[in-house]
Amino acid sequence: MNFHVLTLFPEMIEQGLGTSITGRAMQKGLVSLNAVNIRDYAANKHRKVDDYTYGGGAGMLMQAQPVYDACMAVQSGLNKPARVIYMTPQGSIFTQQKAQELALEENLIILCGHYEGIDERVLEEIVTDEISIGDYVLTGGELPAMVVIDTVSRLIPGVLGNGVSADTDSFMNGLLEYPQYSRPEVWRDKKVPAVLLSGDHAKVDRWRKEQSLERTRLRRPDLYEKYMQEHPDAAKYCK
């Protein structure tokens, strides 16, 4: 998987993703990261890529041409056109299902806005997907872009080392993950549930399913209702 990030702050992207799981994935060659500085495509010596908005209003807007040129420079080096994802609070909410869809791509171009956003004309010209990570506003698209890259990278074979880890994550099957415990067996008078110490894998699996359903019912009733509609047989796990 190759990620190409169009940004005004490439060092933010590189530093933010250069450690932990994504950093190791890049070292192994499982994913690559190409942080493209949009300022490199400015048509002036000051590398200025923003200007005032027509019609008035506060703040500056990223201009169309530098964004377009940066995107076309990346696309020209690919075997086939890549999807261009614009990180914006106006986009559809990013989900695990969307991450699974994106993980099937060979290349992804992620566009990060800044200031008051980007000239609408270039968005209409190059963007294939608009994605939001939540109903709030950030300073720029870099943090959301890193969220997308981290989430998608986890789904690339070999990145986690143990494929089961990703398969049991929250949202992978439409439910929140069950609670987990490690040593010691007793901590501050709190004991690990006895079923997890029983060695009975069937009982452990049932307990985890029950806990996953109950946790989802309490914390995300919207997900719970959807899951139960799609899996009516799961009622046998409900207490």
Question: What do the predicted segments below correspond to?
Answer:
Residues 4-6, 34-36, 83-85, 108-109, ...:
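Hydrophobic/aromatic beta-strand patches that form the interior of the parallel beta-sheet core
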Residues 122-169:
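Structured adenosyl-cofactor binding patch, chiefly the S-adenosyl-L-methionine
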Residues 1, 184-239:
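SAM-dependent methyltransferases
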Residues 143, 155-194:
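Internal, active-site/partner-interface "lid" segment
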Residues 20-24, 100-104, 126:
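Short, solvent-exposed amphipathic alpha-helical segments in soluble enzyme
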Residues 1-75, 201-223:
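N-terminal nucleotide/polyanion-binding subdomain common to many enzyme families
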Residues 63-114, 120:
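S-adenosyl-L-methionine/SAH cofactor-binding core of RNA-modifying enzymes
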Residues 38-41, 114-118:
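Short glycine-enriched loops at secondary-structure junctions
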